[in-house]
Amino acid sequence: MQDQPVIATSDLSAHVGSTVVLRGWLYNKRSSGKLHFLELRDGFGTVQCVMAKSDVGDEVFAAADKVTQESVIDVVGEVKAHPKRAGVYEIAASGFRVLGPTAGEYPISPKEHGTDFLMDHRHLWLRSKRQHAILRVRHTIIQAIRDFFDGRGFTLVDAPVFTPNACEGTSTLFQTDYHGEKAYLTQSGQLYMEAAAAAFGKAYCFGPTFRAEKSKTRRHLAEFWMVEPEVAFMDLAGDMDLAEDFLCFIVERVLERRRPELAVLERDVGKLEAVKKPFPRIRYDEAVAILNEARAEKRKMAGEAEIPDFPWGEDFGGEDETIISGRYDRPVMIHRYPAQVKAFYMKRDPTDDRLALCVDVLAPEGYGEVIGGGQREDDLATLERAIEAHQLPPEAFGWYLDLRRYGTFPHAGFGLGVERSVAWICGLPHVRETIPFPRMLNRLSP
């Protein structure tokens, strides 16, 4: 066995007709008389190894009969192309050995398990074909994010995880002790990217962010990853163009490189292929009109006169976003929300001071907001008034106001949540499967 090369399952096509060694974990096993069918996975994929008793002898055949799920094994055999399925290969096994047996029955058996059980065993659940496919797609999305910004002249600038102040209240921040001072885990690197944009013109940060929200929805995690670009001399229109190009690039990359994984997930790739420019761009007022049309129809169908119209000036909830995005086959951009529901640093619309020059991008199929951004306020006096109006501590923003004191400039940017994007592209019902070890309201382990 030592005389044969150890190869990965991803390289089988180059070794058809050759005898090789495969090394990995026993994913599944079934037997039929004098044949064993061993499914081996090695981290790159899986392959079926067909073992005939006549080819390996009684001792090896008996050892294969006893091997348990997820034992580490070597299988030696000839690589053969599947007679009916193009691109699929099998191993005609001629040798076998166990390198690392399991300590008893593997906890995740082929039977159905509940979500809580699987999350308790997340460290093992990652080995399943479905989870493997999801995290492969996640990897490709992250790679595409970096390639997109690298290809457009952006500089990666790391934002701090510890922040010294609670800029927008402490209700959704994780507080910790920092050498005797109060510190908070970051919710966003955006303010720091504004400083970086003044230094580099085009900058982005990419890292974990933390929200202490008491939310148990399918869209919320306490810890998630976000990429936040910021560009000098860019306005809201340019910001929307950048976001549109960005999402198209990511989806195209996944379709190009991860179709086998999408097939494992039974994802309707036709819905992803529809993600093409231009995206519909509607104002907040138009989105409210869509909601009110839906509510009017609901009143008519259900005969419930007490269903009110959507109140202008409120932010959209998850159900609202689902209704709005349901009108379109691709992401929809909603811009110019009421300033009262957006952050203090958003620039006001010069034609209507009630509105912010902001944009949210809603993914189709009810996946909700995946991008939020806008143009930042670049006037010092206006920003000072906004900080005061939001009852924020002005001393905490001295460095941020310096960006307006010393060479102020128009700029814009956005943030994209990786996990929501993975959920949308993979077609998942919940974000908990989009990150290797999710942190949620009632889950801190494993």
Swiss-Prot record:
A cellular component term, taken from the record's GO annotations: cytoplasm
GO terms (BP aspect): asparaginyl-tRNA aminoacylation
Keywords, comma-separated and alphabetical: Aminoacyl-tRNA synthetase, ATP-binding, Cytoplasm, Ligase, Nucleotide-binding, Protein biosynthesis
Reactions that this protein is recorded to catalyse: tRNA(Asn) + L-asparagine + ATP = L-asparaginyl-tRNA(Asn) + AMP + diphosphate + H(+)
Main localization, broad class: cytoplasm
EC number(s) recorded for this UniProt protein: 6.1.1.22
Cellular localisation: Cytoplasm
Keyword Disulfide bond found: no
PROSITE patterns named in the record: AA_TRNA_LIGASE_II
Regions crossing the membrane: none
InterPro entries xrefs: Aa-tRNA-synt_II, aa-tRNA-synth_II, aa-tRNA-synth_II/BPL/LPL, Asn-tRNA-ligase, Asp/Asn-tRNA-synth_IIb, NA-bd_OB-fold, NA-bd_OB_tRNA
Family the entry assigns: Belongs to the class-II aminoacyl-tRNA synthetase family.
Database matches in PANTHER family: ASPARAGINE--TRNA LIGASE, MITOCHONDRIAL-RELATED, ASPARTYL/LYSYL-TRNA SYNTHETASE
Quaternary structure annotation from Swiss-Prot or TrEMBL: Homodimer.
Full protein name: Asparagine--tRNA ligase
Encoding gene, per UniProt annotation: asnS
